[in-house]
Amino acid sequence: MEIAIIALFIVSIALIAFSYSQRDPMKDVEQELETLQLSAMQEIYKLKKKMTVLEEELLETNLVIRKSKQNDINQKIAKQILSKYNNGMSAEAIAKAEHVSVEDVNTIIKDNEKVLV
C-alpha cells in the first residue's frame, strides 16, 4: 500500500512538472490578440494623421478658391467703377450705384490713375 501511495505521489509530481513545461495555448492567443490590437491602433493613428493633413490641404485650397473668387468680384467692381468714372460720374454717384463707400471708389480711382490716362 505504501508503494502505491509513493508511486501515485511520484506520478502526480511528474504530471505537475509536465503541465508547467507545456506551452499554454491561451498565452499564444493573448499574445497574438495583443499584437493585432497594437497594429490596429497604429493603423488608426496613421489614418487620423493622414486625415488631418488632407483636411488642412482642403482648407488651404478652399481659402485660395475663395480669395480668387473675391478677387474676381473685386476686379469686376473696380472695372465698373473705372468705367463709370471715365463716363463722368462723380465718386458719390458711383458709390451709391455700386453699393460701396466713397473712400473705396476714390481708392480704386487713385490706384488705377495710370490706366485712366
Curated annotation (Swiss-Prot):
The protein's name: Uncharacterized protein YqzD
Membrane topology according to the record: Single-pass membrane protein
Gene Ontology, cellular component aspect: plasma membrane
Chief localization: membrane
Annotated organism of origin: Bacillus subtilis (strain 168)
Gene: yqzD
Domain of life, per lineage: Bacteria
Coiled coil (residue ranges): 38-67
Keywords: Cell membrane, Coiled coil, Membrane, Transmembrane, Transmembrane helix
Localization terms from the record: Cell membrane
Membrane-spanning segments: 1-21
